């Protein structure tokens, strides 16, 4: 009877030791391994509760997730402090790093940072800095250029009125590290030389008769009467 009883006691002791070791793994005190900084930790899922002031970062790999306690959230995440646990949350899709969900610090490629937002292009009046990916400062606009030739449908003649325009470019548009600022332009109405060179004026048509008053035409005919030569019969 003693042998089976001793064997039963040994099995019970082994089960107790196994349960104790499992509890030790699940309750970490920050002494090392993947449970550093954890209050509750499991071998399968890592940390689920962190020590005070630390942030819980959940890394997802497929359907599995693994928790880790960090002093600072990794790039692409920002920290939110809560009553029970501090968590790391992912930044917006266009942010490389952020201060909060609505305020980016650095943008991903093809986007520019402007007042905490990541935009595909910088707004008018700002310069796009290619190295920092930021929209910086106000554009320094240069003076207005000269007026263009007055044209109508691409021609400088043949019409009564046309349009002329001028532009005002940014003073720093040639900066190597900056994109061109928005160019300002304005147009105004202008008179055009109505007949083009070599063309008849609109009032002159081919084969048009003399439209002077009849009495003037008769006077010209009277003045054009030539004296008859002697010996010629009428």
Curated annotation (Swiss-Prot):
Enumerate the SUPFAM superfamilies for this protein: Growth factor receptor domain
Q: Which UniProt keywords apply?
A: Disease variant, Disulfide bond, Glycoprotein, Heparin-binding, Phosphoprotein, Secreted, Sensory transduction, Signal, Wnt signaling pathway
Tagged with keyword Disulfide bond: yes
Any keyword Ubl conjugation?
no
User: Where would I find glycosylation on this chain?
Assistant: 34
The Swiss-Prot or TrEMBL note on domains reads: The FU repeat is required for activation and stabilization of beta-catenin.
Protein name from the UniProt record: R-spondin-4
| The gene coding this protein | RSPO4
